[in-house]
Regions:
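Intrinsically disordered, low-complexity acidic regions
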Residues: 263-265, 347, 359-369, 373-374
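Aromatic- and carboxylate-enriched substrate-binding clefts and catalytic-loop regions
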Residues: 364-474
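Short, flexible loop/turn elements at secondary-structure junctions
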Residues: 127, 139-141, 172, 287, ...
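Bacterial Sec-dependent N-terminal signal peptides
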Residues: 1-30
Length: 474
């Protein structure tokens, strides 16, 4: 991925380092930035109690009223493991504002080159315990984003994140299309209602429609070694609810009813080569029309540049496959008289795909281990042993002849802990058989990970998915 810098300039720098003397205890400093086109304005302030908050307006019309920011953490032994609320008793150390305008080249997508134009505000804060936390805002022409950053510091080497207090208090109540987080499968029916009538958890992305006919989109970007966010509503405010770790986690132990959401090692080198850690970006896209909402590039601009050096193997495609017959009851995943993933069926599907312009054919149920996969504790899946009626050599030869990819399927039944030890062997087997595309599956609300029983969207789950991606990239 290539980057092409355009003019980059700093504007109104109060200070460039966050270790300067306090600007004043619990005053009400106001810092304002505007989007590059001037239509959006963001204001950061501290209350008299040292509570960080922000507000957002568009052409002088309020969109977000002052909304809460911050986190609750349990710090390591350097501060006696105490619970610290980084949502009050904060002092402003410094701010830094920069204007950025760059163009970068995508691996693939609707556009080859994407412009990243935004104004960035970094707010450096310090809690009364001495712990420092930065909040970084980015204001685009079609929305805003922010994230929390913890500089490397002696007082904060390892810590637990207990809560994130990011909130969105809307000046005008929007309606939202949502499904609850508790479904865990993203397969519930989307319901539209005013946010004040949303009484369950919400998954992101969350699409909003405002009274003036404009639209919004709440989601996150750059999710790395962190739990995925969920949301919940109270009146006209949307709050953040991080996916918690479960008590069986081997990542850490704790006492009490409240489970932490993440364990952070703040001493590890970051991608920039320095210690420190950051949360994912929290983003709100704002557009006048739905097509503009879809066309926004904020999420892509917030994700870090691709770290995979050779991206030639990453190719999007439309595909068909053997899977829906299982849901209809006309086929089975396991071997039987109606087994779906057979040599004959794959041959028929591949010929159809070649005739009609599809790039690949997915084969669910090609490998051994499906006999008891729906049981609470599934048997061990084999990712390098096909069923006897699935001749993988003849199928992959046909795949090469027709120019249609065979898409391998690695269903885990939620047993990520059994899948991870097989990753290298499973992907080596796929590569040896000229299988360049693999679909993974986690059909379980709670997955067995190397960190114990965890929610799919937990920090442990995110770590597992990253390991799979890194193995595939090798």
């Amino acid at each position: 991925m290539k980057h092409f810098p355009l003019p980059f300039r700093r504007i109104g720098i109060l200070a460039t380092l966050c270790s300067l003397a306090f600007l004043g205890a619990f005053a009400k400093p106001l810092t304002r930035i505007a989007s590059p086109d001037g239509n959006l304005q963001l204001t950061f302030s501290l209350t008299t109690k040292g509570e960080p908050q922000y507000a957002l307006s568009r052409q002088d019309t309020a969109i977000l009223l002052p909304s809460a920011l911050g986190m609750t953490i349990i710090a390591d032994s350097t501060v006696n493991g105490q619970t610290i609320h980084l949502s009050n008793n904060m002092r402003l150390l410094a701010t830094d504002t920069v204007s950025c305008d760059t163009v970068w080249e995508t691996v693939w997508g609707e556009e080859q080159f994407i412009r990243d134009q935004h104004t960035q505000l970094t707010v450096c804060l310090q809690h009364r315990t001495g712990i420092r936390m930065n909040i970084v805002f980015r204001l685009f022409n079609d929305g805003m984003a922010f994230r929390y950053s913890f500089p490397e510091q002696k007082k904060l080497r390892r810590f637990l994140i207990m809560d994130e207090h990011s909130a969105y208090t809307f000046a005008s109540e929007p309606q939202a299309w949502s499904i609850p987080w508790r479904t865990e499968y993203y397969e519930a029916l989307w319901q539209k209602a005013p946010i004040s009538q949303k009484h369950d958890t919400l998954c992101t992305p969350l699409t909003l429609e405002f009274p003036d006919g404009s639209y919004g989109f709440l989601h996150e970007a750059a999710l790395t070694d962190f739990p995925a966010q969920n949301l919940y509503c109270n009146g006209q405010t949307i709050y953040t609810y991080l996916t918690p770790l479960r008590p069986s986690s081997s990542l850490l132990t704790w006492e009490g009813d409240k489970a932490p959401s993440a364990m952070i090692d703040n001493s590890l080198p970051s991608r920039e080569g320095r210690g420190g850690s950051s949360s994912p970006w929290r983003m709100l896209i704002l557009t006048r029309t739905l097509p503009d909402l879809v066309a926004s590039r904020i999420m892509l601009n917030l994700n870090e540049p691709c770290r995979i050096e050779d991206t030639s193997w990453i190719k999007p495609m439309k595909y068909i496959g053997i899977w829906w017959g299982m849901h209809l009851g006309t086929m089975t995943w396991h071997q039987s008289p109606t087994h779906g993933a057979t040599t004959a069926n794959m041959t028929r599907y591949m010929q159809f795909a070649a005739q009609h312009g599809f790039g690949g054919v997915l084969a669910e149920g090609w490998n051994e281990g499906w006999e008891t996969w729906v049981n609470p504790v599934p048997k061990h899946f084999e990712y390098d042993i096909p069923y006897p009626d699935f001749d993988i050599d003849s199928i992959t030869r046909l795949s090469y002849q027709l120019g249609v990819e065979m898409i391998g399927h690695h269903e885990t039944g939620g047993r990520a802990d059994e899948y991870e030890p097989q990753l290298d062997k499973a992907f080596a087997y796929a590569q040896a058989h000229n299988i360049h595309v693999v679909k993974t599956g986690y059909v379980a609300p709670i997955i067995h990970t190397v960190d114990g029983l965890q929610w799919n969207k937990s920090q442990a789950g995110v770590r597992h998915y990253r390991r799979v991606i890194e193995t595939a990239a090798k």
